[in-house]
Amino acid sequence: MKPYLVLLKPRVIWLLVLASVAGYVYAAPVVDWGSLLALVVVGVLSSGGAAAFNHVFERDIDALMSRTAARPLPRGLVSVGAAFAYASAVSALGVLLSLAWLGPLPTLFVVLGWFSYVVVYTVWLKRRSWLNVLAGGFAGNASFLTGYVFGRGTLDWPGVLMSFAVYLWIPAHIWSLAYRYREDYRRAGVPMFSTVVDQRTAVVAISLLNIASALYMAFLYVLFGGDPLGYVFVAPAVGLTLYTSALALVKKSDDAFWKMFKASSPALALFLIALVLH
C-alpha cells in the first residue's frame, strides 16, 4: 500500500491543498466545514492523481537520478500499467467529486491545474525546454483559485493577484532543488534553468526570484488588508526568505543555496496560514 501512497507525492501536494484551503477561507463570507472538507478531499485526489501521472511519464528519468531512483516505478514496486490505472482512477474521482461537491467553476480550475502539471509540464515541456516550470506553474495558481472561486462564487482580480504568490514560489522552489541536483538533471537530459546557464547566473537569478516572491507576499498582505494576527505569520515568512536568499546570493555556496530551498516551503505555508486567519 505504501508505494501507492508515495505515487501521490504527499510531501509535495500538501502545500497545494493548503493553497486551496487558504483561497476558500479567505474568499468565503462564512466558512462551512463540510465544504472545506470536500475541498480538501478534491485537492488531495486531483493533485495526487496528477502526481501519480508524473511518476508514470517520468519513470525513465527517475531511474537515472539519484534523488528519484528509489521511487516505486524505477524499483519495480508498482507496474507501469497499475500506476497508470491508479493515476487515472484517482484523477477521475477527483474531477467527478469536484463537479458534484464544488460546482462547475471550481472544477474548471481543478481540470486546468491538472492539465497544466500533467500535459504542459510533464509530457510536453519537461524534456524540451527550461521554460517547463514557468509554463506548468499555473498548477499553483489553479490550486489557490479552486478554493477562492468555491468560496466567493466568482473570479475577481484580488483572487488572481493572490494566486500569483503560489506561482512565483514554484519556479523559485523547483529551480533551487534542480540547482542542488544539477548533475542529476544533466545526466537525465532534463533542461532546467540551473542546468542551461552558468552557476553564477543561476545563483543570482534564483536568489533574486526568491526575494521577489517574498516581497510580493508582503505586498499582497498589506494591499488586501490582512488581519493584524496574520502579520505574526507573514513577517517570519518574508524575513526567512529574505535572509536565506541574501545568504545564497552573497555566499554562492551549495550549502547556502540548500538552506534557501529548505526555507521556501515553510515560508509559503506561513503566508497561506496568514490568509486563513484573515
From Swiss-Prot:
Compartment(s) where it occurs, according to its Swiss-Prot or TrEMBL record: Cell membrane
Pfam families: UbiA (PF01040)
Recorded catalytic activity of this chain's protein: heme b + (2E,6E)-farnesyl diphosphate + H2O = Fe(II)-heme o + diphosphate
Keyword Transmembrane found: yes
Pathway of action: Porphyrin-containing compound metabolism; heme O biosynthesis; heme O from protoheme: step 1/1
Gene Ontology cellular component annotations, sorted alphabetically: plasma membrane
Keyword tags: Cell membrane, Heme biosynthesis, Membrane, Transferase, Transmembrane, Transmembrane helix
EC number(s) per entry: 2.5.1.141
Function in brief: Converts heme B (protoheme IX) to heme O by substitution of the vinyl group on carbon 2 of heme B porphyrin ring with a hydroxyethyl farnesyl side group.
The protein's name in its UniProt record: Protoheme IX farnesyltransferase 2
Record organism: Pyrobaculum calidifontis (strain DSM 21063 / JCM 11548 / VA1)
Gene this chain is encoded by: ctaB2
